[in-house]
């Protein structure tokens, strides 16, 4: 998220969305609030035209920046080309949400065992948490710089970005964000 908007633009956007800066990076929440504020600021609905223009320009700039970060991540991962694979199932739509793909099984796959997975003791675990943690470590080894939230969707990056401790409450909010995130952003899950 540090590569998306300048600090001043981020503050402006969050003010227009009526969200606290601590929510910066919670893309599903920001999207939902953007849709609400579009209705409120729309000139045809009696809203402020200048606020609407500024909101649209900042939000579209954020979306473009996040997309370019996701595209960069896909290029860095370059393990296979999507043109080499054909899939017509719903799960293959990279714009679908993680929660929509996993459905009722999401809770079972997000983390197998709290005490084991949270500390990374089981290196063969295939829960979403452990897969994203392994992906984080791989990126760090390859690029010699720690990935940050939005470049990496692991629980560690989430906690470090928002300065949260390890707790069931922060884990709950992280898994809600992952549930509402496009599968293309959480790329390692497709492998």
Swiss-Prot record:
Q: Where are the zinc fingers (C4-type)?
A: 117-130
Primary location: host cell
Could you tell me which Gene3D superfamilies the record lists for this protein? DnaJ domain, Small t-antigen, unique domain
A cellular component term, taken from the record's GO annotations:
host cell nucleus
Q: Which InterPro entries match?
A: DnaJ_domain (IPR001623), J_dom_sf (IPR036869), Papo_T_antigen (IPR003354), Papo_T_antigensf (IPR036092)
Question: Which keywords has UniProt assigned to this entry?
Answer: Acetylation, Activator, Early protein, Host cytoplasm, Host nucleus, Host-virus interaction, Metal-binding, Oncogene, Phosphoprotein, Transcription, Transcription regulation, Zinc, Zinc-finger
Write out the annotated subcellular location: Host cytoplasm; Host nucleus
Which stretches of the protein fold into H1C3-type zinc fingers, per the record?
Answer: 136-157
Q: Name one GO molecular function term.
A: zinc ion binding
Q: Which domain of life is it from?
A: Viruses
In this UniProt entry, the residues modified to N-acetylmethionine are: 1
Q: Which residues form the J domain?
A: 12-80
Q: What is known of its domains?
A: The common region of ST and LT proteins comprises the J domain. This domain is essential for multiple viral activities, including virion assembly, viral DNA replication, transformation and transcriptional activation. This domain is also required for cyclin A-transactivating activity of ST.
Name the job this protein performs.
Answer: Promotes efficient viral genome replication by accelerating both G1 and S phase progression of the cell cycle. Inhibits host PP2A by binding to the A subunit, thereby displacing lower affinity regulatory B subunit. Inactivation of PP2A in turn results in the transactivation of cyclin A and cyclin D1 promoters. Late during the infection cycle, ST may induce dephosphorylation of host MTOR, leading to the inhibition of cap-dependent translation. May establish and maintain high levels of viral genomes during persistent infection in cell culture.
Its subunit composition reads: Interacts with host PPP2R1A; the interaction inhibits PP2A activity.
Name of this protein = Small t antigen
Report the source organism: KI polyomavirus (isolate Stockholm 60) (KIPyV)
